[in-house]
Amino acid sequence: MPDGERHSRPPFPLLGGFALFIAVTAYLVIASMAKRSVPTFDPSPQVTASLDSAPRHDDTITVDATDSKRWQFVDFDRGGVVAPPDTVGWDVAVRRYHVIASDAIADLGVRRFEEVRDVPESEFVVNVVDDDTSNAAIRRWYKYSMVTHLLEPTGHAYAVRTRDARLAIVQILGYYCTGLRPGCLTLRYTYPFPVPGTAHRVAGNQ
């Protein structure tokens, strides 16, 4: 090959670098144009009233978990968020995107909330208590978009077992406050949940 022709071609590393630059630029353009639309919610007010018995709740609660250093507590009996020192009897605690239970949680997989009929006892997982307390059953309730950089629920339903052996069925609807501020974790739940044919059948529903 003549020397003139050899030197007229751009070196391969230069072509590769240019292609990478084009790919990165295209990704950034697509990311900037991506639809940043997820459900947003306003935090639910805290509740203080104590209940002697647990009426059936089918509701949603939005927990203001924007403080990354403090757990926020939900009491299904009272149907809302409770604050210290009035947290005796809490069922679920939330800190940012972390969720734990007072007793245990079972991942029921992707399903419509209304389709939950049974809860296998073997599926329940207790919290792991360490420097960053967590529960493996619900740890990956979200999927993260590399394009929008937002957390979105996976659509799983979860069974939460309370200290007094009642059950709540829970589904996470969102993670963002109004204005797309992270930390407003919103739970849809039904409680107490009767499970025919298991030890978790709620008294009064047998």
Identify the function of each model-found stretch.
Residues 2-206:
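Surface-exposed, beta-sheet-biased, low-hydrophobicity segments with strongly acidic/polar composition
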